[in-house]
Amino acid sequence: MTKIVSIVGRPNVGKSTLFNRIIGYKKSIVNSKSGITRDRNYGFCNWNGIEFCLIDTGGYTNESKNIFDKKICEQFLFALAESDVILFLVDPSNDILGIDYDISKRIRKLKKSIYLVINKIDIYKNIYNTYKYCKFGITKTYCISSINGTGTEKLLDSIVSNFDKNIKIYKKNIPRIAIVGRPNVGKSTLINTLLNKNKNIVTNISGTTRDSIDVLYSKFGIECILVDTAGIRKKKNIKEDIEFYSVMRAIKSIQNSDVSLLIIDSKSGFESQDINIFKIIENNNKGIVLLINKWDIFNNNYLINSYENKIKKIIAPFNDVPIFFTSSFTKKDIIKSIKTAVKITFNLRLRIKTSLLNKIILPILNKNPHPSINGKLITIKYCSQIQTYNPQFIFFTNYPNNIKESYKRFIENNIREKFNFTGIPIKILFRLK
């Protein structure tokens, strides 16, 4: 079982900076404004050959009436419950506050391995300022700088010293599935439904999710990483820097995933921004599954065909995409959509032998040849698949620059149909032979 280490503390003490420092890249958004991290953010670290899971939590507050602060507190408690080790991060530049005592009291009750981590010693080098934290009664104390890394090596050495060296994390080829869409279409609710618990904060306020959150899903014979992302708005509707970073992180999550589940709000329909997100996924050559969410509002199977046909007309010519009409409340077709996304991931990696490709595709092209141009007969000699991550095929012809777009789509559709590339963008190239 993978060991779990969580970073906790009041707002703006450097938790996300330390999280990014340990996992080795900027997965959490870092800003001087407090309250940026809301959900539990998961990352993975390999230190001295030992792997563990790291959780970044939102800044804990105990008296705020703000709805997000209350939800952050819930996420804080969830993180404590699932952790083996707790890093209590403090900032020596401020006096000890009542909230610090509250956090200390809560974590000490758990009887787990606790580290008091005094941050920002690159700025506040007076070691005597750290003695005030003896009041917490936490014996394992480390002074670090999450900005420049001072002291983090000793901290990590101590953390992993009691871990089993044989612990392993995710398989390297496990499918990564990004849950994407406009704000407030039900992305986090979908993940919480799959997990049967409140992993991510859900409210009726758009923009609740800011970081992209990785979640390991292993149920019903399915194993994959689900990535909950911030809602992607149009650029003109982005009102603050944090939201801009969140949208950029969401787009990055699409690029780093195998398949994207694009969630559409059934009530508002397939809007222009949904088309923009669809194009982002397609242009990055990622697999696509469409989820028409909140279908329980309609609960009308007679509408499905007309709704689906309308969407396929909008997304044409790439409309060979699985479409599911789902509801996070009734759980209709949710598992089926995840299974389809996983299947698409493995089909993305499919490599077709050149002999088989030519045996199946060339007879179709010979039966349906490209129209002649200015009396010139266009012939395709043979084809092969390029060794890239996403499916790309190269066709050798006597006039590569004269191939019409419609014929290119004809080839693409036949490859998709014959070799089960449903939901996968295919790139077709032509070269002179």
Curated annotation (Swiss-Prot):
InterPro entries xref list: G_ENGA (IPR031166), GTP-bd (IPR006073), GTPase_Der (IPR016484), KH_dom-like (IPR032859), KH_dom-like_a/b (IPR015946), P-loop_NTPase (IPR027417), Small_GTP-bd (IPR005225)
Keyword flag Signal: no
Alphabetical list of Pfam families matching this protein: KH_dom-like, MMR_HSR1
Binding-site residues for GTP 1, renumbered to this chain: 9-16, 56-60, 119-122
GO molecular function: GTP binding; ribosome binding
Domain named EngA-type G: residues: 3-167, 175-349
Residues covered by the KH-like domain: 350-433
Chain positions recorded as GTP 2 binding sites: 181-188, 228-232, 293-296
GO BP: any one term: ribosome biogenesis
Gene3D superfamilies, per database record: 3.30.300.20, P-loop containing nucleotide triphosphate hydrolases
Keyword Repeat: yes
UniProtKB keywords: GTP-binding, Nucleotide-binding, Repeat, Ribosome biogenesis
PROSITE patterns the UniProt entry points to: G_ENGA
Matches recorded under PANTHER family: GTPASE DER (PTHR43834:SF6)
Xref: NCBIfam families: GTPase_EngA, small_GTP
Role played: GTPase that plays an essential role in the late steps of ribosome biogenesis.
Stated family: Belongs to the TRAFAC class TrmE-Era-EngA-EngB-Septin-like GTPase superfamily. EngA (Der) GTPase family.
HAMAP family: GTPase_Der (MF_00195)
Quaternary structure annotation from Swiss-Prot or TrEMBL: Associates with the 50S ribosomal subunit.
Full protein name: GTPase Der
Organism: Karelsulcia muelleri (strain GWSS) (Sulcia muelleri)
Native organism taxonomy: Bacteria, Pseudomonadati, Bacteroidota, Flavobacteriia, Flavobacteriales
